[in-house]
Design a protein with these regions (language model features):
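Surface-exposed, charge/polar-rich loops and edge strands
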Residues: 1-194
């Protein structure tokens, strides 16, 4: 499809629906709540949900002691797709588009510890790898247990559905599926929300 105007044109507003994960019943009253405080520019097909926990006030407080580096994520609808094959090498990973500015690349390169907020951020940073540079592109990296992380040191994320690529990425980050299950059980027993 070719458009004769930008997707950001206000004329498209009446046709836009906020994409919600399959486990949330679609309700337009949720559209405002299901958006990060830093959602800009338009283009993402889904919210980077780990970022939903960050308010402007919390980000301001974090900025007082840590450096926050921003990148643009265009989360794809494939983020909700389950893995439908037992042979992971046959799974076709969804593609997500991103942009890393030169300022962000400099901050990342100067950092001794990178904490990613969300699995899409992990995929982007692991695709770009150190040394980072200004870059706009896409990633279809599929991170599964056994993957050796090269860019990201810690991860803030949500709970993920069984058989999802996101859960596999978290298992890889933790180190094993068994340890991920143990941590999920602990989190559920303690009433953690993410």
């Amino acid at each position: 499809i070719r458009l004769d105007r930008s997707i950001e044109d206000k004329g498209f507003d009446k046709y836009r629906l906020t994409p919600l994960p399959p486990y949330i019943k679609h309700d337009e009253s949720l559209a405002e709540e299901y958006q990060t405080v830093y959602a800009d520019p338009l283009g993402s097909k889904a919210a980077p949900t780990a970022g939903l926990h960050f308010t402007s006030e919390l980000l301001s407080r974090i900025n007082q002691t840590h450096t926050v580096a921003e990148l643009t994520l265009h989360v794809g609808m494939g983020t909700f797709a389950p893995v439908k094959t037992d042979d992971l090498s046959k799974h076709i990973m969804h593609e997500e588009h991103f942009s890393v500015s030169s300022d962000t690349a400099k901050l990342l390169n100067a950092s001794s510890h990178i904490t990613a907020v969300g699995t899409t951020t992990v995929r982007v940073l692991e695709s770009a790898q150190k040394p980072f540079a200004s870059f706009t592109g896409s990633t279809s990296i599929f991170i599964t247990p056994g993957y050796q992380f090269k860019a990201v040191d810690s991860l803030i994320t949500n709970f993920h559905l069984p058989k999802s690529t996101l859960l596999m990425l978290v298992s890889a980050f933790i180190g094993s599926v068994e340890e991920m299950h143990r941590l999920y059980r602990h989190a559920i027993n303690e009433g953690y929300r993410f």
